[in-house]
């Protein structure tokens, strides 16, 4: 896939007691890349890049706005969880959540104004209506996919909920690194979501033993370019 450069290298060394292989990845942000150079992934539940580039929510960090997860094989699906996406300062906090299928997310309003949260995404459509400070409404996400969340009143508000049946999910650390140990051998799809790039996909083969290293290049984002 053009615009998504990944380097895969299988390392031979491994312990016989190892239950599976490790996938170690690194997200690299490239100032020279732009959204037009990224071909959208052919994926039924894909999330497309955001056209209007709304303002960033504070506090989550550059890589906190990137989600990675692995699909395929025996994912040993994790049960639903309860999570929260606050409405604060006319932003969603956090801006990006990754949750298992069937999870319930609360959307409390912490602002002294009304909000009206909604989504038109195929994976989960909803409209929570108008509600004031101190009130909260919940949404259950029964289907895997990417759900983009907005506010009818404040167009700058934007959030994303990644819903997946995979147990291998992560936000990269502040250096852009992520890893999962003990992945059974087989063929998988590495999924990467970033607001500017949308959803990107790369097929990865996990060997019986050793480690697979993956490097993913995405466009660099900043608060200035987001507006």
What are these regions (language model features)?
Residues 17-227:
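Extracytoplasmic copper-binding redox domains, predominantly the cupredoxin/blue-copper superfamily
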Residues 4-13:
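Sec-dependent N-terminal signal peptides
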């Amino acid at each position: 896939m053009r615009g998504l450069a990944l380097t895969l290298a299988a390392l031979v060394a491994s312990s016989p007691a190892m239950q599976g292989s490790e996938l170690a990845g690194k997200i690299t942000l490239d100032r020279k890349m732009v959204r037009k150079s990224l071909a959208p992934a052919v994926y039924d539940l894909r999330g497309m890049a955001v056209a209007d580039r709304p303002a960033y929510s504070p506090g989550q960090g550059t890589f906190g706005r990137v989600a990675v997860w692995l699909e395929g094989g025996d994912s040993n699906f994790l049960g639903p969880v309860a999570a929260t996406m606050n409405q604060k300062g006319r932003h969603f906090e956090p801006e990006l959540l990754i949750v298992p299928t069937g999870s319930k997310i609360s959307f409390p309003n912490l602002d002294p104004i009304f909000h009206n949260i909604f989504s038109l995404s195929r994976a989960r459509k909803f409209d929570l209506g108008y509600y004031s400070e101190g009130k909260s409404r919940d949404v259950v996400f029964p289907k895997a996919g990417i759900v983009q969340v907005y506010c009818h009143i404040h167009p700058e508000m934007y959030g994303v909920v990644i819903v997946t049946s995979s147990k291998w999910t992560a936000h990269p650390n502040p250096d852009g690194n992520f890893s999962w140990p003990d992945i059974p051998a087989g063929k998988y799809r590495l999924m990467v979501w970033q607001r500017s790039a949308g959803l990107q996909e790369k097929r990865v083969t996990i060997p019986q033993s050793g480690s697979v290293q993956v490097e993913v290049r995405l466009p660099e984002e900043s608060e200035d370019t987001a507006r």
